[in-house]
Design a protein with these regions (language model features):
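N-terminal glycine-rich, Lys/His-bearing helix-loop that initiates the first secondary-structure elements
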Residues: 1-52, 397-398
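Positively charged, small/polar-rich N-terminal and surface patches that mediate targeting and assembly
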Residues: 4-11, 17-19, 63, 224, ...
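Conserved C-terminal alpha-helix-loop-beta "cap" of PLP-dependent enzymes
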Residues: 284-369, 373
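Conserved PLP-enzyme active-site core in the AAT-like
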Residues: 2-6, 14-23, 81-283, 288
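Short loop segments at secondary-structure junctions
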Residues: 37, 225-230, 317-320
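Short amphipathic alpha-helical segments
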Residues: 53, 219, 253-256, 309-313, ...
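Conserved N-terminal alpha-helix of the aminotransferase class I/II PLP-enzyme fold
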Residues: 37-89, 115-122
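PLP-dependent enzyme catalytic core of the Aspartate aminotransferase-like
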Residues: 121, 144, 148-151, 263, ...
Length: 398
């Protein structure tokens, strides 16, 4: 008997959707189905080999993948979902399926490095897809960039790493007036804070590696949209190109989902506290975080980010290049590493040689930190930053 989760809260659905007891064993938690093939029926010729619900071969889909897809689609408010090996695999699967030679794509000046390279380098050269890099916080700039062959507008919520905020509803309205599809990478916000489908976005992409898994021990990505489009992505991109998620990674992410809402609220609260403290420090040149009242898109962020502003912030110091590296050596709690959404806080210095730097606001041009705030005690995090600053004789205040 299928269960009805429609009236349940986000927190409850994160625990229960896709976590039904195993009918064969009675186990109340999902097993890991480490099989690459599944038993065929008596007459396999009568099967629909491309059906998503048919367990045939793990590249087509599997038990753990299916359970996770059900949960992610529900949490995002989407009709269906395809889970893949990584966030970049999810992005590539979407673009590969929906775009063709001669199409034009508008993408934001602030995007993840792999997305930037896909659109700015690979797709132009290899596939003949035209692209325009546009400040997607500027609706007039998007309007001017639209061409007769524009097929897709892609942006992030918020943007990585400047934390800019795009007006999702306004972009969707403009795009759909011109029969253009809209995709949003929601990784920095997560479905706990923002569900872009509620604003009319056609496709949402998530790096499940980040907040939704939350433990820094697996990789996965998801595309969420209509059932019709997800079936095309499964068949065209997952089955025929690859990029399928491993059963164990799907299981780890499914497990992470159960505590995801609780962790996400702590990420939100901690990041706001750290951002507010950083903004008061004389040694800090700027702080980019949409939860700050000083952020130019703060009011829009409040409208779109229902429960908080995410766990990532960026900031700069008054000082030269190597000061950033020296400060990091004094940190005890923060780990110098890429990624985000882990229980532990991470920090990375992005120097002046970042290939996207020319697209960022001027305050970023001298280099900056991108900080992924974890779920430690916020006072411990602030104290760790304070002592690291003071070790380099930087002025701080409480």
């Amino acid at each position: 008997m299928s269960k009805n989760y429609d009236d349940l809260s986000f927190v409850t659905r994160a625990i229960h959707v896709g976590n039904d007891a195993d009918p064969a064993t009675g186990a109340i938690e999902p097993a890991v189905y480490m099989a690459n093939s599944f038993l065929l029926p008596y007459d396999a010729s009568q099967m629909n080999w491309s059906a998503s619900e048919a367990n045939i071969y793990t590249r087509n889909g599997g038990v753990n993948q299916g359970m996770l897809e059900k949960k992610i689609a529900n949490l995002e408010g989407g009709e269906d979902c395809v889970v893949l090996a990584s966030g970049v695999a999810a992005l590539s699967a979407l673009f590969f399926t929906k775009l063709k030679k001669g199409d034009h794509v508008i993408f934001s000046t602030v995007t993840y490095i792999a997305t930037y390279r896909i659109f700015n380098e690979l797709w132009n050269d290899k596939w003949g897809i035209e692209t325009s890099i546009v400040d997607c916080t500027d609706l007039e700039a998007i309007k001017k960039a639209i061409r007769p062959n524009t097929k897709l507008i892609h942006f992030e919520t918020p943007g990585n790493p400047t934390l800019c905020i795009c007006d999702i509803e306004a972009i969707v309205k403009l795009a759909h007036e011109h029969n253009i599809l809209v995709s949003a990478d929601n990784t920095f916000s997560s479905p706990y804070n923002t569900r872009p489908i509620e604003y009319g976005v056609d496709f949402v992409v998530e790096s499940l590696t980040k907040y939704i898994n939350g433990h820094g021990d697996s990789m996965g990505g998801a595309v969420i949209g209509s059932h019709e489009d997800m079936e095309k992505i499964r068949y065209q991109a997952q089955v025929n190109i690859g990029g399928c998620i491993s059963p164990f990674n799907a299981w780890l992410i499914q497990r992470g989902c159960t505590t995801f809402p609780l962790r996400m609220q702590v990420h939100n609260d901690n990041a706001l506290a750290v951002a507010e403290w950083l903004e008061r420090q004389p040694c800090v040149s700027f702080v980019a975080y949409p939860g700050l009242k000083s952020h130019k898109n703060h009011e829009l962020a409040k409208k779109q980010m229902k429960h908080g502003f995410g766990g990532v912030l960026s900031f700069g110091l008054h000082g030269e290049h190597d000061l950033y590296n020296r400060v990091v050596t004094h940190l005890n709690i923060f780990t110098s590493a890429v990624s985000l959404g882990n229980a532990a806080s991470l920090i990375v210095f992005l120097g002046e040689d970042d290939e996207r730097m020319y697209l960022y606001p001027e305050e970023f041009h001298g280099g900056f930190y991108r900080v992924a705030i974890g779920i430690e005690d916020k006072n411990d995090l602030i104290h760790d930053l304070k002592q690291a600053f003071e070790a380099e004789h930087l002025e701080t205040v409480d």
